[in-house]
Amino acid sequence: SNYTLPPSTTLILNYLRSQDIKCFFVGGVIRDSIISSKPHEQGDIDIAIEGDALIEGKKMAQALGGVYVELDTKHGICRVVLKTDSKQTYFDLTSSNYGIATDLKDRDFTLNAMALNIEHIQACNQSHSFNLANVLDPFGGLGDIKNRIIKSVSETSIINDPIRTLRAIRISQRFRFQISEETSEQIKNSSSLITNV
């Protein structure tokens, strides 16, 4: 079955396809499109680029009349802010130099560790959609969405970045999903670290 992407992706897709670079939509944009039949315009859309995201981000901002913001030069992460219908949409670009599989392994929860090659996105009536068969899902995120469970990608997901605890709670409240036992245990074990953030 097909799932619709938020309208703001249309603008960016046309541009990315014209650039002949291998890139993927990752994380929340896929998750939200699957969970909600009418994906609302979310704050940001994550894009993993096999190449230098900082260079591509600058080019994108210039071509689309957006604002370029460098978030993490060392890891090649930047943001392009575009105005669409009086709203701002953030596109966060990451350099995925070691391939998309490595990129997903470093993500927080299985339901965010999914990717979609932009080549597999179809246009239909003014919007864009994708088929579940084309979603890269090495950690079982689709199954966890179906079962309404938040599960960390690895045993060290939370301890490596304690802020993810807050993200788990936020996702849990927003979608009324359960946090898995293993992930709850990780949260408990790293709760002392959150004060250091």
What do the predicted segments below correspond to?
Residues 1-197:
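Catalytic cores of the polymerase beta-like nucleotidyltransferase superfamily
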